[in-house]
UniProtKB/Swiss-Prot annotation:
Cited PROSITE patterns: SHIKIMATE_KINASE
Organism: Halorhodospira halophila (strain DSM 244 / SL1) (Ectothiorhodospira halophila (strain DSM 244 / SL1))
GO molecular function: ATP binding; magnesium ion binding; shikimate kinase activity
Cofactor note: Binds 1 Mg(2+) ion per subunit.
Gene: aroK
Transmembrane segments: none
Subcellular location, record wording: Cytoplasm
Pathway: Metabolic intermediate biosynthesis; chorismate biosynthesis; chorismate from D-erythrose 4-phosphate and phosphoenolpyruvate: step 5/7
Positions annotated to bind ATP: 17-22, 123, 160
Protein name: Shikimate kinase
Length: 177
């Protein structure tokens, strides 16, 4: 059996509350790669918060900034990148993610997303009267896009971040190189 080689670029996609940042850090640790959160990179580059960008520039302005960061981050080697939940809504992002690395979709049911995000005020798309309905709507819209771009799908329920990261490694080891 051939020795498995760690991919040099792993991109995590999935809805808010999937654990992309938490699991991404664990995965990077396990594989000896650098972890980068695309939302944190946007905030570092702009010097302002994601909610501020949404308030001032709207979602379209944020998506334009996100696309530039995704383009940059997907060109780096030795990284695990956690993308924002809506990154896949931009066709160019899907193309870059799929062409430049291995994409892992962290599938998470809405009930779990809601539990994980209910007290987080740093999520502009959840500032609604009915966050659960909003999450349902976003998942219905984005799940096909996550699946389209994903090389592997790993469910994030029923385990701590480290065990999810281990399941990702196992799933990646089963992928053709």
């Amino acid at each position: 059996m051939a020795h498995w080689r760690t991919p040099s670029r792993i991109f995590l996609v999935g809805p808010m509350g999937a654990g992309k940042s938490t699991v991404g850090r664990e995965l990077a640790n396990l594989l000896g790669l650098e972890f980068i959160d695309s939302d944190a990179a946007i905030e570092a580059r702009t010097g302002v918060s994601i909610p501020w960008i949404f308030d001032i520039e709207g979602e379209a302005g944020f998506r334009a900034r996100e696309a530039a960061v995704i383009d940059e981050l997907t060109g780096r080697d030795g990284v695990v990148v956690a993308t924002g939940g809506g990154a896949v809504t931009t066709p160019a992002n899907r193309d870059l993610l799929g062409a430049r690395g291995v994409v892992v979709y962290l599938y998470t049911p809405v009930s779990v997303q809601l539990q994980r995000t209910r007290h987080d005020t740093n999520r502009p798309l959840l500032q609604s009267d009915d966050p659960e309905a909003r999450l349902q709507s976003l998942l219905a819209e984005r799940d096909p896009l996550y699946r389209e771009v994903a090389d592997v799908v790993v469910e994030t329920t029923g385990g701590r971040a480290r065990s999810v990261a281990r399941r990702i490694v196992e799933a990646l080891q089963g992928q053709p190189s």
